[in-house]
Amino acid sequence: CNKLKLDKAERGDKASVDNTELLKWLDLWEPGSVIYACLGSISGLTSWQLAELGLGLESTNQPFIWVIREGEKSEGLEKWILEEGYEERKRKREDFWIRGWSPQVLILSHPAIGAFFTHCGWNSTLEGISAGVPIVACPLFAEQFYNEKLVVEVLGIGVSVGVEAAVTWGLEDKCGAVMKKEQVKKAIEIVMDKGKEGEERRRRAREIGEMAKRTIEEGGSSYLDMEMLIQYVSERSPSRA
């Protein structure tokens, strides 16, 4: 499951980027040097909050992939990108943007990825854990704050951006600042740090990633759970009545 590049690329929706081009770009960078930033398919951030994220990513001086979902391509964000010269600076830095759906599993499994900046949705959390990648946690609403605690406080494989309040759906403009560029920069720098604490976090992430992969192999807990589910459904199928 998800061992072949094609399987990884086709997980979820159709990617909005050429996978060959994406992999060629990733191959340019040293192992563990690239930040992958994606805040899910229903992110509720305003254009100025997305601008803070973009500036924070830029200020780390690390290569990064930034996923801008269709709903996030607002007029305000596009105006800011053009007026502030952000896209021109992006071309000079050679960062990679994905506008739309991202082949997330394919990206996270590449050795160049050193950190996953995520909203901590459960699917993304599991994909980050399974890939063995340290997480920068930026929860926005609902159970994402519990998932943040899991990766930061329980598993010890992540760092929190410091979001203190949930984004209320439909009232994003009234929620105030979720994060500032300085918070983004600081959290990423902690995760990417080459010191003892950073190395231990990466070791833990790799170790837990291997544990997660074993659960879906034959005899693993998830493998057995799926077998039991299939058996349960089959035994109750009308055709067997």
Curated annotation (Swiss-Prot):
Q: What are its GO biological-process terms?
A: anthocyanin-containing compound biosynthetic process
Keyword Cell membrane carried by entry = no
Residues annotated as binding an anthocyanidin are A142
A GO molecular-function term, please?
anthocyanidin 3-O-glucosyltransferase activity
* Annotated SUPFAM superfamilies: UDP-Glycosyltransferase/glycogen phosphorylase
- Which Gene3D superfamilies does this UniProt record tie to the protein? Glycogen Phosphorylase B
Keyword terms of this UniProt record: Glycosyltransferase, Transferase
What the entry lists under InterPro entries is as follows:
UDP_glucos_trans (IPR002213), UDP_glycos_trans_CS (IPR035595)
> Where is UDP-alpha-D-glucose bound in this sequence?
Q104, H119, W122, N123, S124, E127, E143, Q144
Q: In which tissues is it expressed?
A: Faintly expressed in cotyledons, roots and leaves.
List its EC numbers: 2.4.1.115
Pathway of this protein?
Answer: Pigment biosynthesis; anthocyanin biosynthesis
Which region is the signal sequence? none
Q: Which reaction does it catalyse?
A: an anthocyanidin + UDP-alpha-D-glucose + H(+) = an anthocyanidin 3-O-beta-D-glucoside + UDP
Matching Pfam families: UDPGT
The family classification in the record reads: Belongs to the UDP-glycosyltransferase family.
Tell me, what does this protein do in biology? In the presence of other necessary color factors, this glycosylation reaction allows the accumulation of anthocyanin pigments.
What is the name listed in the Swiss-Prot or TrEMBL entry for this protein? Anthocyanidin 3-O-glucosyltransferase 4
